[in-house]
Regions:
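N-terminal accessory segments
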Residues: 1-89
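Conserved alpha-helix/loop element of class I SAM-dependent methyltransferases that forms part
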Residues: 112, 126-148
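Conserved class I S-adenosyl-L-methionine
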Residues: 148-158
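Class I SAM-dependent methyltransferase SAM/SAH-binding core
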Residues: 153, 163-209
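A short acidic, Gly/Pro-enriched loop at the edge of an enzyme's catalytic core
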Residues: 208-221
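A short glycine-rich, Lys/Arg-flanked "PGG" loop and its adjoining helix->strand segment in the class I
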Residues: 236-248
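C-terminal alpha-helical "lid/dimerization" subdomain adjacent to the S-adenosyl-L-methionine
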Residues: 253-318
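Core SAM-dependent methyltransferase catalytic element
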Residues: 299-344
Length: 344
């Protein structure tokens, strides 16, 4: 139930926005029961994932160390300060989020994020949870067939789920993955090497300050399901950095859940807002109401150069259902996203 009939009967008017829709839905016991189950499922997923990672955390760290020791493709910065908008949130109900270290050389939260994420997505992102990256590659090769990048940057790339397919698709390019979290970066390089992907490097840095890179350093700058983790000021700063760093003729692409527009029903908006209230995604709601075209323009991109599109995850159809391609609406759960970006 979307609560509209009851709301109209009680107030004598239609709902004005998604916030009124959400509050009306809170009076529906079916919605509350579904919401409680969904939250409990996420907590149980984290408990199970962390249980399997924590009990072998020292062994995992040893393996990662052997794979990455003295490898200059892992560039960590012990002096980095994790901003409050990151440190104050256990994203996706994961204790310690992506950045917390339990001992020197730790990779626990990277391991948890990697293997338990498969469960969260029910396999719809493929056996390596990399369907989003393959989707981006397909989109670029289809829409920009002559594009031959040499330097690629992914901001907020964690363990490289979406980055490695790009690196594999463009083997002559150098792929740089930037993230704040040392555990996910250590794990990410070890994971990449174990998968035989060598044209990557993992750098600990904030996407808001990439001053270690010179202007116009990259042909392609990518974020994948990352913008909703950002405060509004951080998003603006990162957009500014992408404009500074992209080369003439290069592209910037952001892959995200769709923005809230007048074409989207208030019920759908309220359902999509669930993550903001119950899945530790405090910036989700605000970010999805932003006019990203305007945000891009304010960062210095010409409106005429903006790119829009859509992608669905590419998975092994022999092993997993291609659920992202069906026409049903599940309010943000299926592996289908919008693309916004620019060609400079």
């Amino acid at each position: 139930q979307n609560g509209e009939p009851e709301f109209r009967k009680k107030t004598g008017r239609d709902m004005a926005n998604r916030h009124e829709a959400r509050k009306a839905m809170l009076g529906d016991y079916a919605y509350k029961f579904w919401s409680a189950l969904r939250r409990a499922t996420m907590e149980q997923r984290q408990q199970a994932g962390r249980w399997t990672a924590l009990r072998q955390s020292e062994r995992l760290a040893e393996i990662a160390d052997k794979l990455t020791r003295d490898d200059d493709r892992l560039q960590l910065n012990p002096a980095i300060k994790v901003p409050r908008y990151v440190s104050g949130v256990d994203h996706h109900c994961m204790p310690g989020s992506y950045h917390t270290e339990y001992f020197p050389g730790d990779v626990t939260n990277g391991a948890n994020y990697d293997h338990a994420g498969f469960v969260t997505t029910a396999g719809m992102l493929g056996k390596y949870t990399d369907g989003g990256g393959h989707a981006v590659v397909n989109w670029v090769k289809t829409n920009l067939p002559d594009f031959k990048p040499k330097k690629i940057l992914e901001i907020g790339g964690t363990v490289g789920h979406s980055s490695l397919p790009i690196a594999q698709a463009y083997p002559d390019a150098e792929m740089t993955i930037v993230d704040l979290g040392a555990p996910v970066l250590r794990y990410g390089l070890a994971r990449a090497k174990s998968l035989g992907v060598d044209n990557v490097r993992f750098v600990q840095a904030s996407g808001e300050d990439l001053s270690m890179f010179e202007n116009e350093s990259f042909d392609w700058i990518q974020t994948t399901m990352f913008l909703h983790e950002l405060s509004s000021s951080a998003l603006r700063n990162i957009f500014n950095e992408t404009r500074r760093l992209v080369k003439p003729g290069g592209i910037v692409l952001h892959v995200e859940q769709p923005q809230y527009t007048d074409d989207m029903s208030l019920y759908e908006q309220a359902m999509r807002d669930w993550d903001a209230f119950y899945n530790n995604e405090p910036f989700w709601s605000r970010m999805h109401e932003l006019d990203l075209d305007t945000q891009m323009e304010q960062a210095g991109f010409d409106r005429a150069s903006l790119i829009h599109g859509g992608v669905t995850a590419v998975v092994d159809k022999d092993l997993f259902p291609d659920a992202a391609d069906d026409d049903s609406e599940d309010y943000g759960r299926k592996a289908a996203w919008h693309v916004i970006g620019a060609r400079v």
